[in-house]
Structures are given as structure tokens and as C-alpha cells.
Amino acid sequence: MESNEDVERLLCQKYPGLAAELQPSGACIIRGVLGSEDTWRRLKLYLPHHPALHGFQLYVQESLEYKLYTSANLKLQDDWLLEDFLDHLPKILPAQKAPTVPKELCREGNIYYDILALYKSNEYCLQVDEACSMIRFSEFTDFEQHYLELKIPSLLLLDHSLPDCVSLGEMLTKSAGNLEEALNLFRKLLEDLRPFYDNFMDIDELCHVLQPSPISSKHKTRLFPLKDRVYLKLTIADPFACIASMSLKIIGPTEEVARLRHVLSDGLSNWDSEMNIHKNLLRMFDLCYFPMPDWSDGPKLDEEDNEELRCNICFAYRLDGGEVPLVSCDNAKCVLKCHAVCLEEWFKTLMDGKTFLEVSFGQCPFCKAKLSTSFAALLND
């Protein structure tokens, strides 16, 4: 028997104007708007023996009233399933009863005609809510994680998947006069941002990204291990100018940070524009690969359950904001491992008037060795 998710997936892929509801009795109710060529039909389909079609009741709006269709006045083939029924419905319903979109309204930019013209594309998924008040584009070709949500018919921006620094709402107001123009603008931005996402893709796949977690298409920062107790923080301030706005910070014990900063400086001066960021970083630090998660088979202890990874202050591994314990001191034998925010709060309770991890102050609360000022970068997201 088809689940509610199966029916919703079918409607999402082929009939974006329809929504389904499964009743506890097993019956299925499908309601909404079904489009075909220049014709829209508002309907309600009741299937008491879902997924079978026998006993169906179909209510179709004609003018201001709903007309009831059953097996008595609507011919169905015996082997039809729900998808066959909906596919053939525009052909088996009386054509003269179907309301059509006036051509003059089409020329003037009728929003529902625009939806009908756009929803058949295989390059994205189009969904409309039951009230026809919101439209969502998602699963774009080459950009599967991205989405655009607009209020209709006003085309007011509701949500999107681009970084927050992209002023999409302002761009839509200035440059998009109809639904197609809004969609084309968003897709153009995706193409313009391709280098931004491509540069992060190798890092996300080939490095052990610790922060942010979970990664989304809105994030402009990646923090991942360079070696034991040493981390790289990559930030791209302007997604439209990846290399020009890129910043790299090395985080870890003082001596290691000082040495690696010289390596970083030399590497940046010899940057290879033919390589992406990931390959340049490997070449810069003379590495074949960065530390990666353990992908081996066999039982592994979950990070949240691994006591060795937990913060020495809050005794948790990952905070609600996605932060993990990365702070350690210059003493390699010290057990200190904690979140930067936890250590900052701990120091605030002890030292009035002191600023955590400034040059003038920063000692390990366990062994009194020096705390590198580089860890302050963890607090500046």
C-alpha cells in the first residue's frame, strides 16, 4: 500500500498544485489545482479504497459550483492506478467545462499562467502549497541543495538557500517583474556562485570539517584540522569574489602557529590560480591530504559518546551552535580540551577586567602553560 510520503512525492514531481491527505481509515483525499496546457481545474478527489480507484468521488469546479464525477459518468480503465487517472483526467473530463486562462491575462503576466508554463521543467522541482499562496523551487540541476520560496501572487521573498550576505530580496524587487524573471535571476546567481560552492565542495568531501555543523549552502566558513591540535579556518567574505575575499587563520599551540604562518605567507605569495583552494592548501603545506573522518568499516564510538573528545568544562562535545572542543594549551602533555566559548565564560567568572586570549593574558587553567591567542579566531564567527 502506498504511504502518504509516496503519494506526496508523486504529486510533488508531476502535479505541484495538488496535495494529499491519508485518513486513518485508509482513504485518501487529494485536493488542489490540476493544470494542463492552458487549462486549470480546481478539484477534490476522494478515494475510499486507496490505492484502488473503485468507489472514487471526483468533485471538479465548473464556474461557481462543483460537479461530482463517479464511475457512473466518468469512464476509467480497469488497470489504471492513481498516476494514470491524474494523467488522463484532462482528456476524459468534458473539455467545454474546464475554465481557461484568458489570453489577454496571459499577455499581461498572469501569475498562475506563469506557474503552468514553468512547472514542467526537468531542471528543478516546483511546488505550490494548497492555498496557492506560496511557491517553492528546489533541486536545481547541479545545485540540488538550493531552494527559492516566494509568496504569490506578490512574489515577495520568503526564504532562499544563498548566503545571507546576498541581497536577494532587494535584487528581486529591482529586477524581477514576474515569476519567470525571479526564477531566472536566482538561477543566474547560482551560476555566478558556482566557484564559491565548487571551492568548498572538495573541502567538505576531502577534509574533516568540524565547524559549521551541519554545513549548509549559506555558510561562508569552514574549520578543519591541519594536523594534531592545529586547525585551519577558511572564510570567504564575498561569495562572488572567492580568492580576493578569502581569509585563512591557523589555530593551535603558539610555536606551531608561528611556524605555519610563515608557511602560509609564502604559499599565498605563490598561489596557483589554476588550482582550487583545496589543492592550493595541500601544495602550500606540502601535504597529500588533510586529516579525514574515519570512514573504515566496523564499530566506531559516536563522537557525542566519546569522553576523550568532550569539553573539560561543560562535558559536552558539540554545542547547540555546532562548536566542538578545539582549545588546547602549549603543553602537549596537558589534558585541556574545551570549547572557546566555555573557556571564555570560565575566565570571566575568575578574572574581572581581563579579556580572554588577548596578548597580555592567557594561561591554561590546568597547567598554567600559555594559551595561544590564535584561539580567539574561534570566537569571531
Curated annotation (Swiss-Prot):
Keywords: DNA damage, DNA repair, Metal-binding, Nucleus, Transferase, Ubl conjugation pathway, Zinc, Zinc-finger. Disruption phenotype: RNAi-mediated knockdown gives no visible phenotype but increases sensitivity to DNA cross-linking mutagens. Residues 110-293 are annotated as: UBC-RWD region (URD). A zinc finger (RING-CH-type) spans 303-374. Pathway: Protein modification; protein ubiquitination. It is found in: Nucleus. The keyword Disulfide bond does not apply. Gene3D superfamilies: 3.30.457.30, 3.30.457.40, RWD domain-like (3.10.110.20), Zinc/RING finger domain, C3HC4 (zinc finger) (3.30.40.10). Its EC number is 2.3.2.27. Ubiquitin ligase protein that mediates monoubiquitination of Fancd2. Ubiquitination of Fancd2 is stimulated by ionising radiation. Together with Fancd2, and probably FANCI, involved in DNA repair of damage caused by agents that induce interstrand cross-links but not agents that cause double strand breaks. Contains three UBC-type E2-like WD40 repeat-containing folds. The 2nd and 3rd of these form the UBC-RWD (also known as the double-RWD or DRWD) region. The UBC-RWD region may be involved in binding Fancd2 and FANCI. This is E3 ubiquitin-protein ligase Fancl. It comes from Drosophila melanogaster (Fruit fly).
